[in-house]
Amino acid sequence: MKASLSNRRWLSIGLILMLFALLSFSIMPLLTSILQSQHSSGQSHLSAVKQEELASQALGYQMVLEREPDNQAALRGLLDTRLQQGDLKQAIEPLEKLAQLNPQQSDYLLLLAEAKQQIEDYAGATASYRSLLASHPQNLRALTGLTNLFLSQNRHNEAISLVKDTIDRALKAAADPNNPASLIDIVSVQLLLGKIYFEQQNYPEALNTYKQAQQMDVNDFRPILATAIVLKEQGKNQEAQPLFQEALSRAPFAYREEIQSLIRSQEIGVRR
């Protein structure tokens, strides 16, 4: 059953909620959040004076880096200046250097991947995401970023294979606490896989994936909510309604308002 545009919108919001709830980071890409923060500070339309000031700052940092190429304070300063200028192409070089100097700080490599994706260097973005996942396989933001990159290029099979391989890797490493892959949040990755199937309107696979996720953690409200959303999309409102209520009862307080909004939307859909 094909949902209306507004219906699809709240379903998508619900899927985003259930996928990223309980995680410690925003779902917004790191680069986007930085740029939006700067724009909200009045930097979206730079005056000539501000442009000149930033250009002078950039030159100063570059002069320091000519003498001290590994000076991280100068690299961070140059990166921040380039971002304030909105010049992502020029931000790549200091980002690459910072990522190289700080291999354990995943934010630099993640920001590099997102910047390359923004400037349509998709091969470079893919390489950066893969490099990050090789050293930090538990980084769900990187996994989601690479998955979305594949999906945006209509590389659906690669996206699904990537997520499935991550689940397999996590399951194999579960008994080895020294393996970084043992830190992968398997339920969240399963929810990501289910979301891909949902967006492809492959509802049987989505439901099966959410069932597996629920079996992994019977106390997690997210697979229950996801199942309800899929059933709602199929027009199975009577089956969906008790699952929405169950998800609401299991969810932490911080997420109940959003779930209640989904339930109200579901009830409106039933009356129509």
Where are these regions (language model features)?
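N-terminal leader/linker segments that initiate helical-solenoid repeat arrays
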Residues: 1-77, 85, 93
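Conserved structural position within tetratricopeptide repeats
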Residues: 63-67, 97-100, 130-134, 168, ...
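Helix-start (N-cap) detector for alpha-helical repeat units in TPR-like alpha-solenoids
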Residues: 72-73, 106-107, 140-141, 174, ...
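Canonical tetratricopeptide repeat
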Residues: 77, 111, 145, 192, ...
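Position-specific recognition of the canonical hydrophobic site in helix A of tetratricopeptide repeat
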Residues: 83, 110-113, 117, 151, ...
